[in-house]
Amino acid sequence: MINIGLSGSTGKMGRAIAERIDEFENCKISAKFSSTNSLYDLDNFCKHSDVFIDFSTPEILETLVNYALKHNTKLVIGTTGLQPKHFKLLEKAAQTLPILYSANMSIGANLLSYLAKEAIKILDDYDVEILDIHHRNKKDSPSGTAIMLAETIANGKDLDIIFNRGNRPRKKEEIGISSLRGGNVHSIHEISFLDDNEIITLKHEALNNNSFANGAIKAAIWLQDKPSALYSMQDIYKIY
């Protein structure tokens, strides 16, 4: 039996994971951490968990990582809005622990990332724009997924990622991200490749949180026999 701790248990993703855990054999929720708990509770929670899934806030990450290192608890990190210091923390901890980080745990979004990486090889002279749409209550903008997609496309192309152009025209050597927040939209990401004659658009839309929850649980199971390293969902789905 795999004991899975859950950080951010009262949020949308935490609830979705708890609701779907019974669909996976030999898995159970061993601990639930939320904003009502003390950070010190993470010590005991990590002690009794084989792996911790984190969908909380960036402020909790350092404490969670420290207790995970203390108890050799594997980590699946889905919290977005992380800063460079957080990624450095994960990279260092991954020398000791198997850790999987992804801004989006669904197979669809990761397939979109792969398709975009392949498309830019052919459409390398096209303008690239990303549209990121989420519900009105999402805090980070642009989304972690939008940044992941932009970084995938920009990798090796020497392209700047732009969130706000202000009053200037578009430059050729950039990828623009536009964010919309409103209603109860779960998640929509569109990547458009544009030239003077045509527009090619790749799109992923999540209709609910189930695909993210399924991906997170699969990641927790997948990590069990893996050596220490920092992994992504593309390692699970084998789409590079």
Swiss-Prot record:
EC number: 1.17.1.8
Broad class of the protein's primary localization: cytoplasm
Keywords: Amino-acid biosynthesis, Cytoplasm, Diaminopimelate biosynthesis, Lysine biosynthesis, NAD, NADP, Oxidoreductase
Source species: Rickettsia canadensis (strain McKiel)
Listed InterPro entries: DapB_C, DapB_N, DapB_N_CS, DHDPR_bac, NAD(P)-bd_dom_sf
MF terms in GO: 4-hydroxy-tetrahydrodipicolinate reductase; NAD binding; NADP binding; oxidoreductase activity, acting on CH or CH2 groups, NAD or NADP as acceptor
Positions annotated to bind (S)-2,3,4,5-tetrahydrodipicolinate: H135, G144, T145
Localization per record: Cytoplasm
Similarity annotation: Belongs to the DapB family.
Active site, per annotation: H134 (proton donor/acceptor), K138 (proton donor)
Name the record gives this protein: 4-hydroxy-tetrahydrodipicolinate reductase
